[in-house]
From Swiss-Prot:
It comes from Treponema pallidum (strain Nichols). Substrate binds at residues 112-115, 189. A monovalent cation. Ammonium or potassium. Its EC number is 2.7.1.33. GO terms for molecular function: ATP binding; metal ion binding; pantothenate kinase activity. It catalyses: (R)-pantothenate + ATP = (R)-4'-phosphopantothenate + ADP + H(+). Catalyzes the phosphorylation of pantothenate (Pan), the first step in CoA biosynthesis. SUPFAM superfamilies: Actin-like ATPase domain. This is Type III pantothenate kinase. Its cofactor is NH4(+); K(+). Belongs to the type III pantothenate kinase family. It is found in: Cytoplasm.
Length: 273
């Protein structure tokens, strides 16, 4: 099955397989989201990249999409259908009743489907209360209690969003490459911005996880995901990083929900990564 995560920073394509009865996923490639591209342009690009990744047409017969970019949802779904001849299923609130996590009414109407997929993957893995941190366009924290109830979400500016905002919102600060400096004491402008944004985000993550644990009432597990989570891979005493968490969640959801109940290519999703 082809898995597609349409986010604000990347459109991530992966493929689902099984290893000893366990769901496993493999990321194939990433695209920059571009609302100006047509269905035909996306179809040609996706087909070429799938072939380069060794994925044949037969593997595209089933596709499952999460999207938090509504303007792109139908375009990409139709592009995949153009290649495979089968319309993908778009994950949305129609499926929430069939998940191992529960979403309370105030959250249900607004939570991004990518965050739901993250929560599913983490809860299936830990089988207990957990906090999921997603480092994307936004920095998000999703807290799940021991019963599988999503207690809430916190959203902050993501790393790239922060450095771009400093560049566009000031007269002299340059657009700084993202890197984790050794010290918070910047010796030049680039180092100073990296110290404040990247090191600062690291401290925010640690503090927010601790506060989520306090409000959940337990010292629960945590996991980090998202395209920029790699920046923290060298950190010790830090939660594990799982760059494939969203795709894993989609793979679990695709197996759990009766997708035949939904007319495919229904636009869904909310603000997310």
């Amino acid at each position: 099955m082809l898995l597609i995560d349409v986010g604000n920073s990347h459109v991530v394509f992966g493929i689902q397989g099984e290893n000893g009865g366990r769901v496993c996923v493999r990321e194939l490639f990433r695209l920059a989201p571009d609302a100006r591209k047509t269905q035909d342009e996306y179809s040609l690009l996706i087909h070429a990249l799938c072939e380069r990744a060794g994925v044949g047409r037969a593997s595209l017969r089933d596709a499952f999409i999460s999207s938090v970019v509504p303007v792109l949802t139908k375009t990409i779904a139709d592009a995949v259908a153009q290649i495979s001849g089968v319309q993908p299923v778009v994950f949305g609130p129609w499926a929430y009743e069939h998940l191992p996590v529960r979403i309370p009414e105030p959250v249900r109407a607004e939570i991004g489907t990518d965050l739901v997929a993250n929560a599913v993957a983490a809860y299936v893995h830990f089988r207990s209360a957990c906090v999921v941190v997603d480092c994307g366009t936004a920095l998000t924290f999703t807290a799940v209690d021991g019963t599988g109830l999503i207690q809430g979400v916190a959203i902050a500016p993501g790393l790239r969003t922060a450095v771009q905002s400093l560049h566009t919102g000031t007269a002299q600060l340059p657009l700084v490459p993202l890197a984790l400096p050794d010290s918070v004491l910047g010796k030049d402008t680039t180092h100073a911005v990296q110290a404040g944004v990247v090191r600062g985000t690291l401290f925010v993550i640690r503090a927010m996880i601790a506060q989520c644990q306090k409000e959940l009432g337990c010292r629960c597990a945590a996991v980090i995901t998202g395209g920029l989570s790699r920046l923290f891979s060298s950190e010790v005493d830090f939660p594990p990083i799982d760059a494939q968490l969203t795709l894993s969640g989609l793979a679990h959801i695709a197996r759990l929900v009766p997708t035949s109940l939904l007319p495919p290519a229904t636009v869904s999703g909310s603000s997310g990564n």
